[in-house]
Amino acid sequence: MVYDYIIIGAGSAGNVLATRLTEDPDVTVLLLEAGGPDYRFDFRTQMPAALAYPLQGRRYNWAYETEPEPHMNNRRMECGRGKGLGGSSLINGMCYIRGNAMDFDEWAKLPGLEDWNYLNCLPYFRKAETRDIGANDYHGDSGPVSVTTPKKGNNVLFHAMVEAGVQAGYPRTDDLNGYQQEGFGPMDRTVTPHGRRASTARGYLDQAKSRKNLTIETHATTDIIEFEGKKASGVRYFKGTNTTPQHVKARKEILLCAGAIASPQILQRSGVGPEDVLNEFDISPVHVLPGVGQNLQDHLEMYLQYECKQPVSLYPALKWYNQPKIGAEWLFKGTGIGASNQFEAGGFIRSSEKFAWPNIQFHFLPVAINYNGSNAVEVHGFQAHVGSMRSPSRGRIKITSRDPHQHPSILFNYMSTEQDWQEFRAAIRITREIMAQPALDPYRGEEISPGKDIQTDEQLDAFVRERAETAFHPCGSCKMGNDEMAVVDGAGRVHGIESLRVIDASIMPNIITGNLNATTIMIAEKMADKIKGIKPLPASQADYYVAGHSPARRN
């Protein structure tokens, strides 16, 4: 079969491209996805409060593991990635955070990326979004991604934690995606008005999947991209458990949207990557590109947990005998505890004036539990997820075999610089100062984790090594740019190759300040216009906050 475009990966970026490209009825698109459908009757992926469940299984999660991380007690750490229509937007925490304006302005300083500054990206964030309280200079009201804002009457602990951050001397902000990211405030979520997860499968593919010019193949594992010389011409993939490969051809382009872990793997297997990797697995080089799989970045975070003196936390919702009622309210009304991811407040701060924009992120949660649903504390409690935003540490991804079913070797090299340790120590100490504020006096009990005895630098470092976990934000492994380690240009085109683009979180040159999903969707929206060859949306004129010489904290 021949299509105009073949998209590899029906995730946060691939579904955007499939939807936008098939708006033209004369353009044919094949969308290949290694996972299955996003079953709408499966509460694990559709109920926001059930976000921990997909991470515990394998149906929707590739469940990669890292190599032993040398600075983290040689732990093999989780690296969950979404599998199925929606990709990681099918299993993520649904936090709608776009990053800081300065992240994009920094990207735009790199040669060839001049049009990736914030004011050129903002129109594409708006294009993708329908915010439940309407549009303004920063937000959209007619896009495929449903965004829900926290409502009055939500858990009192959210308000107390934001108030405590302000009492500790940090700014207050009413919109973490608006004029000013820096500060504490309410956190939006990608949830529909009916309380369902707003994955890109729901938001984008639902409007496109009935189009005759879009073909969606699930359980289709891409083996390699096929080339004629240096021109990408087709894809070889396996359908289900069938060991006979399928071959499809592209008239125009192949768009690789398999994510920060799988995109570099597919390139390497196809003969595009570092010479030593291609040689090791006896792969004929199509084009030697040393940056494929390099520059890997992520966010690391810790949980600081406290007992709650009043019975206001979500602890009762963890009890099996309360869950049928919560489930029924969500199923029939789309409301209640089940309709929220429970990350309804958070913030971004600078740990010192040496950072020009926030370097620490907080998510507040009114229960004490691990992100993947394990190790729930058997008392009323609450916690802050806290971690650094722009670690200088860099890792890598490389294939371990030519077999597409084999997981790659992943090394993030977490905490490999002195800056990492300084930021994490500061983050723990600042969090404790916030938790000690009067706003939390009615609620704050004993510190559960790390525990009040953990005070010295050495003790804090040991806690980080033993307990810090991924925030599930891998990116950067096929970075945009023009330098010798860049893999794609500012339009996602692979250097040295014709008719092949990479469009997903792997192309971010530097990780952003916050969760990655909204930005990955924005990147795909912006790239869709580049692929179509149409004029970009006009740059925004909106103001945005630059800290300048403002203190990081008022005394």
UniProtKB/Swiss-Prot annotation:
Pathway annotation: Amine and polyamine biosynthesis; betaine biosynthesis via choline pathway; betaine aldehyde from choline (cytochrome c reductase route): step 1/1
What NCBIfam families would the database entry show?
betA, PRK02106.1
Gene designation? betA
**Role:** Involved in the biosynthesis of the osmoprotectant glycine betaine. Catalyzes the oxidation of choline to betaine aldehyde and betaine aldehyde to glycine betaine at the same rate.
Gene Ontology biological process terms from the UniProt entry: glycine betaine biosynthetic process from choline
What is this enzyme's catalytic activity, as reactions? choline + A = betaine aldehyde + AH2; betaine aldehyde + NAD(+) + H2O = glycine betaine + NADH + 2 H(+)
Question: What organism is recorded for this protein?
Answer: Proteus mirabilis (strain HI4320)
Q: Which positions in this protein are listed as binding FAD?
A: 4-33
Provide the alphabetized UniProt keywords.
FAD, Flavoprotein, NAD, Oxidoreductase
Catalytic residues at: H473
What does the sequence similarity comment in the record state about its family?
Belongs to the GMC oxidoreductase family.
What are the required cofactors? FAD
What does the record give under GO molecular function? betaine-aldehyde dehydrogenase (NAD+) activity; choline dehydrogenase activity; flavin adenine dinucleotide binding
Q: Extract the InterPro entries matched here.
A: BetA, FAD/NAD-bd_sf, GMC_OxRdtase, GMC_OxRdtase_N, GMC_OxRtase_C
- Recorded protein name is Oxygen-dependent choline dehydrogenase
Q: What is its EC number?
A: 1.1.99.1, 1.2.1.8
Q: Which domain of life is it from?
A: Bacteria
Record carries keyword Oxidoreductase = yes
User: Which Pfam families does the UniProt entry name for this protein?
Assistant: GMC_oxred_C, GMC_oxred_N
